[in-house]
């Protein structure tokens, strides 16, 4: 059995990988945009003597060129909708209870980018 945190991470990684290029860490210089970078994962355990119940918050980061505003918005929307449809992982039943999206302008060297942040919270049963 793996932790609920890793279980959600694996499920989110699979969903993102089906919709775009996904990385677990900063991709190499020269990587094509847009891409997805899985960020932090937060585990909030509920006290229980006989089972593991938890909420897991997964942060997903999206990067695109400054000419790809529509692309990043659509990619974030597609990932969010696909995650909302998830009802179970390899070891747990899950339910998305909350999501939050933000799109920011960002400068990386001489490149102007869009940086999207999608935070999703799952209840793990």
Where are these regions (language model features)?
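Small/polar-rich, solvent-exposed N-terminal microdomains that initiate assembly or binding
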Residues: 1-50, 74-81, 86-93
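Short, conserved charged micro-motifs
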Residues: 67-74
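Short, charged interaction patches at domain edges and termini
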Residues: 1-14, 43-55, 92-125
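Short amphipathic alpha-helical patches
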Residues: 35-39, 62, 102-107
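Short beta-strand-to-loop capping motifs
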Residues: 62-66, 122-124
């Amino acid at each position: 059995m793996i932790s609920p945190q890793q279980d959600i991470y694996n499920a989110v990684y699979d969903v993102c990988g089906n919709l775009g290029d996904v990385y677990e860490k900063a991709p190499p210089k020269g990587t094509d945009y847009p891409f997805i970078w899985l960020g932090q994962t937060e585990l909030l355990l509920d006290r229980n003597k006989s089972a593991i119940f938890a909420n897991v918050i997964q942060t997903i980061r999206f990067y695109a060129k400054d000419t790809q505003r529509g692309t990043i918005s659509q990619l974030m929307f597609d990932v969010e909708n696909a995650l909302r449809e998830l009802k179970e992982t390899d070891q747990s039943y899950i339910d998305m209870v909350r999501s939050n999206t933000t799109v920011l302008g960002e400068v990386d060297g001489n490149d102007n980018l869009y940086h999207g942040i999608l935070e999703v919270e799952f209840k793990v049963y």
